Amino acid sequence: KIFEQAKIEFEKHIIKWGYQKSINDYIDCLFMSDIIPVTSNHDFFGISVMEAVFCNVWPILPDRLSYRELFKNKGHIENLYTNDNQLITKIEAAIKNIHQIRNQALKKVAQKYDWNRLARVYDSEIEKITK
């Protein structure tokens, strides 16, 4: 219900909404984005967040799930929040400082999960166990 309300209220500001029909549309959508505020209580490893970060989208994440390991332990506590007030404050700060956050490349956080790198690692590990 809240998403339906947001879609109506922010209709003039929304460029893309919902499921993207192709991977290229999805990637284009990520590259057009600046901020990804996440409120989920469940996330499988944070893959969608890593995809967004790889496309230079600024994440605002709950200090739980895999995000703590992916960001806080890497020194990026500014991307994590612990309550709704912090979430709102961090979103407001990101919007007010949008030019600065666009220059804050966190891509290096996501690069170690790039498939071009991981495929070789997986191939090597699979080869070890099949010998």
Which stretches of residues belong to each language-model region?
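Nucleotide-activated donor-binding/catalytic signature segment of Leloir-type glycosyltransferases, i.e.
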Residues: 2-21
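Structural motif corresponding to alpha-helix initiation and N-cap regions
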Residues: 20-23, 84
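Short alpha-helical segment that forms part of, or immediately flanks, the ligand-binding pocket
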Residues: 27, 45, 50-54, 68-69
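Short alpha-helical donor nucleotide-sugar binding micro-motif in glycosyltransferases
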Residues: 27-33
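Aromatic "clamp/platform" in nucleotide-sugar-dependent glycosyltransferases that forms part
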Residues: 41
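Short hydrophobic beta-strand element within catalytic cores of glycosyltransferases
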Residues: 58-61
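A charged, aromatic-enriched C-terminal amphipathic alpha-helix characteristic of glycosyltransferases
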Residues: 96-130
